[in-house]
C-alpha cells in the first residue's frame, strides 16, 4: 500500500495544484512510483482517458509530471458547472446527472465509498500518492460529510502540508486562522506549512516564520518564490484569461463565453513568437484580430444567447464576412451551424424540446442526445480549403467530450478520425465553409492545435494573408516543452522546500 501525503491550501488559488505537481515530479525523479489524487474537482476543463472516462485536467497535469498515464482513479468525482447554482456530476468518469448545490450536498455522503475505493485501488499500485485538497479545509459551513480535505486525509491516513499564498497579503493570519478552525485531531495531522508565491528577500520574512511556528506548533517546511513556469494550472485560469496581452504581429482572440471549457486547447499559441492570444468578452475588446476562436462550453445554447445579447455574434459575423478566420471547437463548433436542437430541454432546464438558431456560418445541424460522447481520437486533416489549406493531410489527435450529434455534408468535412483505443471505423468529422471566403472551420476534437506543426502552420497562414512571414520559425514539440517546465518546477521545489523534512513526514505518517 502506498504512503500518502496530502496538500491543502488556506484558500483557493493558494497553489495546491502546482505544489502537488512539483512534488509528484520530485518523487518520480527520486525513483518512486507516484500518482496524484483529488477526490472531488470542480472545473470546466476536463480530459478523456484511454478508457473513455472523463476527469479533471489538474490531475492529468500532475500525472504527466509523475510520468504516468492519467486514470479516472485519480479524480473519481468531477463537478462541471452548468449554471451559477448547478453542476453536472461525473462519478468514476461518467455523468450521473445535473444537480443544484443543495441536491448534491444531500446525496454527497453516498459517494464516500466510491472515493475510498478509487483511492485504495490507486494506492495499491503506487509507492506514493500525492493528494490535493480543494478550496480550504476550514470551510466550516460545508464540513459535514467532507471527503475532499481533512476528511480525505483521515480516509487516506495521510499527513498534511498546508500551502499559503503570501502574494495576496495576510499570509500569517490565513495560516493561523485555518489551523485554529480545524478540530484538534485534524490540526494534529498538519505536519508542515509551505508559504507560496513569495517575492523579495526571504530573510525579511524569517521573524514572522519563527513567530507563526511558535503560535501554531507547525513547522514551516519552505518558502516557494513566485515562479515563472508555464504549467497548466486550474488555479491560474483567472490570471491567464483576464491578463491583458500585448497585440503582436498575429492577434488571436478567444471569445470568453460565460461557461467556457477546456481553455487549455489554445495554450500552444502562446509559445509561438509574434503571436498574442487574448481572451475577450466584448465587441470593444474583440478589436481587429487575425483569427477568432469560439471555444468549448458547458452550455452551448446559453452561451450562444449570450453572444447574441452582448452583440458579439453580430461582430463575429461581420468579421467572418470580411474574411477574418473563425474557428469553433466543440460547443463553439455547434454554435457556428444552422441550428441546435434540444429534444429533452436539458440545457435550459425546462425539460421541453426546443430549437436554437445557430450563427449560420457552417452548413451543420446539431441535435443533443442524452448520452455524452467521451473518447480519445486520432486521424488527420482532410482536404482543407482556403487559408488553412496547408493543414491538409497533417496528423492530429485529441479527445471528444460532447452530447450532440452533428450532421453535415461529408464533402465539407474538416478531418477524418477514428477512436484510438477501439476498433472503430474512420469517419468524417468537423466542417468548413467551401464557398465564399473559405475562412470558417469547426471540430469536436479538443487538443486539435497541439499536434506537431499544426499551430505553426496556422500562424504561417495568418502571416501569409498579411503578406508577411516569420523567419526561422521552429516547429514546437509541445510534449517536450511541458517536460522541461515540469523539471523547472521540480528544481524550485528542491531548492526552496526542505525535502528531507517532507520525506520524514511522509515516512512517519499520522
State the predicted function of each range:
Residues 337-394, 398:
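A conserved active-site-flanking secondary-structure segment within enzyme catalytic domains
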Residues 1-325, 342, 370-371, 382-510:
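Flexible phosphate-sensing "switch/lid" loops adjacent to ATP/NTP-binding sites
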Residues 330:
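Catalytic nucleophile serine of serine hydrolases
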Amino acid at each position: 500500500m502506498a504512503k500518502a501525503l496530502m496538500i491543502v491550501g488556506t484558500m483557493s488559488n493558494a497553489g495546491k495544484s502546482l505544489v502537488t505537481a512539483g512534488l509528484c515530479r520530485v518523487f518520480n525523479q527520486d525513483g518512486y512510483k507516484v500518482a496524484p489524487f483529488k477526490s472531488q474537482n470542480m472545473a470546466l476543463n476536463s480530459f478523456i482517458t484511454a478508457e473513455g472516462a472523463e476527469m479533471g485536467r489538474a490531475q492529468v497535469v500532475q500525472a504527466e509530471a509523475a510520468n504516468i498515464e492519467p486514470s479516472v482513479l485519480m479524480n473519481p468525482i468531477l463537478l462541471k458547472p452548468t449554471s451559477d447554482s448547478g453542476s453536472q456530476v461525473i462519478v468514476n468518469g461518467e455523468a450521473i446527472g445535473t444537480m443544484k448545490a443543495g441536491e448534491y450536498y444531500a446525496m454527497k455522503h453516498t459517494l464516500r465509498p466510491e472515493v475510498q475505493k478509487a483511492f485504495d485501488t490507486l494506492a495499491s499500485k503506487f509507492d506514493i500518492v500525492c493528494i490535493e485538497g480543494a478550496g480550504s479545509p476550514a470551510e466550516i459551513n460545508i464540513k459535514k460529510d467532507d471527503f475532499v480535505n481533512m476528511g480525505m486525509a483521515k480516509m487516506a491516513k495521510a499527513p498534511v502540508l498546508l500551502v499559503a499564498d503570501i502574494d495576496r497579503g495576510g499570509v500569517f493570519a490565513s495560516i493561523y486562522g485555518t489551523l485554529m478552525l480545524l478540530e484538534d485531531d485534524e490540526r494534529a495531522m498538519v505536519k508542515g506549512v509551505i508559504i507560496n508565491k513569495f517575492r523579495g528577500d526571504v530573510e525579511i520574512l524569517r521573524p514572522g516564520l519563527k513567530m507563526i511556528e511558535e503560535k501554531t506548533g507547525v513547522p514551516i517546511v519552505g518558502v516557494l518564490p513566485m515562479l515563472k513556469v508555464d504549467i497548466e494550472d486550474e488555479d491560474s485560469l483567472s490570471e491567464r484569461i483576464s491578463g491583458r496581452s500585448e497585440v503582436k504581429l498575429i492577434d488571436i482572440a478567444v471569445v470568453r463565453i460565460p461557461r467556457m471549457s477546456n481553455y487549455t486547447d489554445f495554450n500552444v499559441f502562446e509559445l509561438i513568437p509574434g503571436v498574442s492570444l487574448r481572451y475577450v468578452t466584448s465587441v470593444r475588446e474583440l478589436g481587429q484580430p487575425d483569427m477568432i476562436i469560439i471555444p468549448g462550453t458547458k452550455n452551448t445554447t446559453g452561451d450562444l444567447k449570450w453572444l447574441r445579447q452582448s452583440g458579439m455574434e453580430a461582430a463575429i459575423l461581420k468579421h467572418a464576412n470580411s474574411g477574418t478566420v473563425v474557428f469553433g471547437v466543440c460547443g463553439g463548433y455547434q454554435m457556428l451551424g444552422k441550428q441546435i436542437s434540444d429534444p429533452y430541454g436539458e440545457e435550459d432546464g425546462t425539460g421541453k424540446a426546443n430549437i436554437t438558431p445557430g450563427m449560420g456560418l457552417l452548413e451543420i445541424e446539431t441535435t443533443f442526445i442524452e448520452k455524452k460522447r467521451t473518447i480519445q481520437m486520432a486521424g488527420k486533416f482532410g482536404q482543407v480549403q482556403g487559408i488553412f489549406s496547408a493543414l491538409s493531410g497533417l496528423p492530429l489527435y485529441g479527445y471528444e467530450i460532447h452530447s450532440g450529434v452533428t450532421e453535415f455534408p461529408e464533402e465539407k468535412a474538416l478531418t477524418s478520425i477514428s477512436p484510438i483505443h477501439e476498433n472503430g471505423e474512420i469517419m468524417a468529422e468537423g466542417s468548413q465553409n467551401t464557398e465564399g471566403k473559405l475562412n470558417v472551420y469547426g471540430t469536436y476534437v479538443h487538443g486539435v492545435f497541439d499536434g506537431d506543426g499544426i499551430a505553426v502552420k496556422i500562424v504561417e497562414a495568418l502571416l501569409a494573408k498579411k503578406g508577411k512571414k516569420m523567419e526561422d520559425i521552429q516547429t514546437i514539440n509541445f510534449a517536450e516543452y511541458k517536460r522541461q517546465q515540469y523539471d523547472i518546477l521540480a528544481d524550485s521545489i528542491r531548492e526552496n522546500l526542505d525535502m528531507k523534512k517532507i520525506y520524514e513526514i511522509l515516512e512517519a505518517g499520522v
